[in-house]
Amino acid sequence: MRFRMFYCGLVFSLLAIEAPAQEQNPAEGQSTVQESTPPRSDAADSLKIFISADMEGVVGVVSDAQIGPGGFEYERFRGFMTAEVNACIEAAREAGATEILIADAHGNGQNLLVERLPDDVMLVRSWPRPMGMMEGIDSSFDGVIFLGYHASTANERGVRAHTFSSANVTAVRLNGMSMSEASVNAAMAGHFGVPVIMVSGDNVAVAETQVIIGDVEGAVVKWAKGFHSAQTLMPEAAYRVIRDRTRAAIERIDEFEPYVLESPLRLELSLKHYRPVELLSYLPNVERVNSHTVRFVGQDILEISRFLSVALGYSVDLQP
């Protein structure tokens, strides 16, 4: 997914982040789950599910032609994306979900066809938003589902493999670990004590996510043959797989553990172009590591997310 340019408000938000008083060893840090967050519901009949919906991992998607407003197949594939979300919602309801919030987490954040979604869900749309692809998550949720996800920029396989921006980002590391969108977003959920329970996408994305965050349910809807090629299920078959894996995930929801990163979090962000790195280095608490990499230390994943929102809001069109 790609972020639109939205520096102004978020830069001022970033300036409000205070530098840590003393450097800490990550191994000695504390859990990112904060006591100030709202308590999760203990009601036996309440089951809240958060869905983060990306597009590159949707059935049949292989190139730009399907994933952006300029693509000749985009309108059709918006329909497939929406249908995958609906398949997940349907199965989640059948398995006992009482509340569902969806974050449209691809491109301009306005991909899902709202008129085709059921009227008993809520939807987060468009940018900017400080928690990015996870906007709306909090400790009241019981589980998170990633739909239409893809492999990371560090993975040599996977359809449309990238991390946050295929146009600008070459690496994202937290405390020395290479991160994918799935792992960053899982850490966002883990901050609030909420586990990821299922992921859908190509075989590479599903396997990568399971290696990083654990044995979550995986709905494989296509098999990567290259960056722009795949062997894919047909839409109706993909919806069946998503329904099946969603039901399985909710049936074993108590088995999953939140993916929690200990603080402080040292983010190293490597970009393709030198100019955004230079500009980011002007901000407080940001260190330029080399011509293409900056380092930022955040006290929790929310601070990291705010910084990423600023950094990835840079427009590639402004490159020299």
Protein language model regions, located:
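A glycine-rich helix N-cap at a beta->alpha junction
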Residues: 119-137
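Mature N-terminal segment immediately following signal peptide/propeptide cleavage
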Residues: 41-64
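Active-site rim beta-loop-alpha module in soluble metabolic enzymes
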Residues: 188-196, 200-247
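Bacterial N-terminal signal peptides
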Residues: 7-16
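Active-site glycine-rich loop that binds ribose-phosphate moieties when present
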Residues: 166-192, 201-204
